[in-house]
Amino acid sequence: MDLQEAAMEARNGHRIPPTEEKVIIDTDPGIDDSVAIMMAFEAPGVKVVGLTTIFGNCTTSHATRNALILCDRAGRPEVPVAEGSAEPLKGGKPHVADFVHGSDGLGNTSFPDPTTTNKVEQSAAEFLVDKVSESPGEISVLALGPLTNIALAMKKDSSFASKVKRIVVLGGAFFAAGNATPSAEANIHSDPEAADIVFTSGADIYVVGLNITTQVYFTDKDMLELRNSKGKHAQFLCDICKFYRDWHVHSYGVDALFLHDPVSFTALVHPEYFTFKKGVVRVETQGICKGHTSMDMGLKKWNSDNPWTGYSPISVAWTVDVPKVLAYAKELLFNAQ
């Protein structure tokens, strides 16, 4: 095996990106966000350029505090954190899933404030625009919460969609039930106007919806293995996951927890573990189906224009290799040094 081939092989056979994957994580941490962020900090070949925060699993102010806690605990206090919008594009009180993630977003664990931080003065949208403009075509965005900050970046800079390398979105429910309402997934439901702007922007977008993420979960046995592992984040993650796991038992009747955000991070680094279908996606912005993601798969030729006409297709995750995604998550979490 030559050096180039060796660079393609990570521990346990997981491919390392042949070129460094630079990513800004737009996030509402959040318990499963925290798991994904710790994975990103540990992943070979991945450089976290910064974290931008948004409401969703908790308020934006709590999301910022939690992002700083995560950077501190990961030994990465130099990573910049930019605070994002406190409300959706249209204004109003944001949806906050404290019943899933606790009042603090970290399972009511009451961790102390970090001692060393790098919270920047820029807003999340300003940070996104500046970093992507500095390195056009090189920086991806992993969007783990409502898409408000991304939409604001696109409004601020009309060329943002063409300069960002790709945007991987945790959001939507494609031919599957929602989790905020029967028709809508939480991130999209929390700011449907922002989601529609992003999905129709022309950027290179990959969407990972509930139809994929609910196939991948850690059982109680997996969590026990994590707690007993030598991973440096294991105890912290197990502590915050208890609240999240108990909510799954109550809401879904399963002794497990879905890995929505870790799956989406894996789709960024290992898209080969998924298959995707392309189509134009629009978002319903009002009524009882607010937040519903509707995809034109191009299966027929329409006789006249419709609201999907003229927009660029995006890539929607269609299938997932569950064992490979689980193995990748365990590799990063169980062996973090």
Swiss-Prot record:
Compartment(s) of residence: Cytoplasm
Biological process per Gene Ontology, one example term: purine nucleoside catabolic process
SUPFAM superfamilies cross-referenced by the UniProt entry: Nucleoside hydrolase
Keyword Hydrolase among UniProt keywords: yes
Catalytic residues (positions): H260
Any one GO molecular function term: purine nucleosidase activity
Reaction catalysed by this enzyme: uridine + H2O = D-ribose + uracil
Principal localisation: cytoplasm
An example Gene Ontology CC term for this record: cytosol
A family per Pfam: IU_nuc_hydro
Enzyme Commission (EC) number: 3.2.2.3
Keyword field: Cytoplasm, Glycosidase, Hydrolase
Record-linked InterPro entries: Inosine/uridine_hydrolase_dom, IUNH, Ribo_hydro-like
Domain of life per record: Eukaryota
Family statement: Belongs to the IUNH family.
Cited function: Involved in pyrimidine breakdown.
Protein name: Probable uridine nucleosidase 2
